[in-house]
UniProtKB/Swiss-Prot annotation:
Family under the similarity heading: Belongs to the CbiD family.
InterPro entries: CbiD (IPR002748), CbiD_sf (IPR036074)
Organism: Synechococcus sp. (strain CC9605)
Gene Ontology BP, a term: anaerobic cobalamin biosynthetic process
Any GO MF annotation of the entry: cobalt-precorrin-5B C1-methyltransferase activity
Enzyme Commission (EC) number: 2.1.1.195
UniProt-recorded name of the protein: Cobalt-precorrin-5B C(1)-methyltransferase
Coiled-coil segments: none
Keyword Methyltransferase recorded: yes
Catalytic activity: Co-precorrin-5B + S-adenosyl-L-methionine = Co-precorrin-6A + S-adenosyl-L-homocysteine
Amino acid sequence: MSGSIAPSSPGLTLPVWVAAAAKAALQVLLDEPFNAEQQLNQGSDRPSLQVPVCSAAPLSDGQALGISRCDPGPGLDLTRDLEVWVRVAWIATPQPVLELQPGEGVGRLGPEGDICLSGFARELLERNLLPLLPAGRGLMVQPILPRGRSLAQRTSNAAFGVVDGLALIGTQAEVQRSAAPDQLQEVLAELEARAADPAFQGRLVLVIGENGLDLARQQGLGPVLKVGNWVGPVLVAAAEAGVRDLLLLGYHGKLIKLAGGIFHTHHHLADGRLEVLVALGLDAGLSTAELLQCRGAASVEEAFQALDPDQARALGQHLAAIVEQRSHSYLARYGAWSMRIGAALFDRSRTLRWWGPEAEKRFFTLRD
């Protein structure tokens, strides 16, 4: 079909599979024949998507169920082959509306909270379902991920307040490979464009993921560039592009890898987080018992929580300082640039906790 793309090459994010299953279920409610290839509208400036669905069937009392199976494309992804169920039901409303409810295995913002989904996910559902609703009817849409609760235990969702399952937080249809070379090229192209902008003043904030991006905006830090896991190459490229002051802003469980000299932060390539934390704890004067406690923790967050507040603060500040030092050392291996690198770390509640001396001097001097 002209103007459409199939899900085979880049892979599609979880919200796309939810929207496709929801549309198939709605078509059943409308007494239309089952369509195993759903066309999804992304908006006027994007090509439509052709997304396969497995099945759809009516249920009792004005309900229907659609099922798709997630294909995130090549690469390692825990959502591969994940069954996506979506239950839909009519609701009486004066105007066509969608009522989104989290089903089993779908993340909530807190135990009694709302469904955790991105603006992109909501817009994709609204764009493809609302035009099909008859007058005087709304639609309840309940995504269900039968394996979502168990898979969520292998993610950092809980670190950011998402409970009970996987969050539907894709920000675009195609899967972005944070460890893939293509993703690095996109970041480098964006960096080059930023640096070439006449308004660019030589300051840049690098974040790894969406949580860092949101926090940077909340804190008024910028301009911001999301780099995924390619921290090392982007550091060098930033120096080459003329960046003078660079801030690394990230979750402590990610940036701690830089303190250990690991500058590609994808967990499939290298880990060593707790080992690095123990080494830093030794520097900070923790006792043998405290070091063993850190080594046996399930996560960096848990290790910090087990320490008393003064110890945690001292260790966190030391961590931020070492991230700065190791980043400067990494950069010096590739050239003699004068770019200054600061580091700031946030915790599982997305609270900015610690920053190093360079970050203090260049980015946080005027803060409370």
